[in-house]
């Protein structure tokens, strides 16, 4: 139901029968955490930063975050770990100077004395993070089922955003994830207050084009690339 968008878009470029039918997390929910001695993003010049991979979207995120402080690609070192948990462990072990982390690992790091230098959403709000992707062949045979799934998803987002449901949502997520309730509460508030979940079911062409452009920066997609090939006619709802 929920997946990062980079890999499916790469697959579509290689003619895989996939389509993006909804955005889920419409902006990147990462935070950049650093050792206690590092107080500002500008201090990361020449430092070692843990990212997801050499062609992972987190590389674009970090480059966007460092650019306003005058730090260009090549002026910091990178080490790669695909999982947020691994990047958090490297930071806490002192193996790296900074790491890009998802909730609740950013909260764990802050509690341990590490500094949050910034949120990715403040530097790249136009880049969507995750969405709903379907196999076109399956969708063609199961249209009514797909529509019910998408309808249920839209209702679940509305339910999540209703403050009356906070306690129940936290309890459900704590039970499912086996994460401490306190950490789930922080994560819930982060996602709810930041309006990270797309509430309308409409995919922004601007956001989709921005993600394609970012992937082209990484050399992942050809130029030109028609974003219309990413969507499913009659199912994907596109807006500006």
Specify the residue positions occupied by each region the protein language model found:
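Residues within well-ordered alpha helices
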Residues: 10, 65, 108, 172-173, ...
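Phosphate-coordinating loops and pocket residues in cytosolic domains that bind phosphorylated ligands
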Residues: 46, 111, 232
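Secondary-structure end/capping motifs
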Residues: 140-221
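Residues at alpha-helix termini
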Residues: 14, 69, 112, 177, ...
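Short, glycine-/small- and polar/acidic-enriched structural segments
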Residues: 1-74, 78-90, 97-103, 116-120, ...
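Pocket-lining segment of extracytoplasmic ligand-binding domains
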Residues: 7, 85-176
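Short, hydrophobic secondary-structure boundary micro-motifs
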Residues: 20-21, 118, 169-170, 200, ...
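Conserved C-terminal helix/tail region of periplasmic/extracytoplasmic solute-binding proteins
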Residues: 209-240
